[in-house]
Amino acid sequence: MNGFLNQSRSIPGGRVFMVSGDSMSPKYPSGARVILERANEDSFIEWGAVYVLDTIDGEILKRVYPTDDPAVIECRSENPAYPPFQVKREWINSWWRVRMMFVLG
């Protein structure tokens, strides 16, 4: 599915994921790796930043924004072909802030 990720390996203090699909292209192309740092949702979420959200439906890479309802966030793709959608905070198991992206070969 577009926007979903496959974990490739873990590193101390963070995680590395491989981007799958084109919903976050061109900035995050399919096959790119993103280095993630776990975020504490209770202390600070940087709205408009890119996160991997570990949800009850799987992991998604999206730019996150607040909504009028504090129990819900809006997730946006980089690719304008994919419309924004909302996710209930209670469906999110963990938040991972994207700190770096690299493309191999």
Sequence positions of predicted segments:
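Acidic/glycine-rich C-terminal interaction modules and beta/coil loop segments
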Residues: 7-105
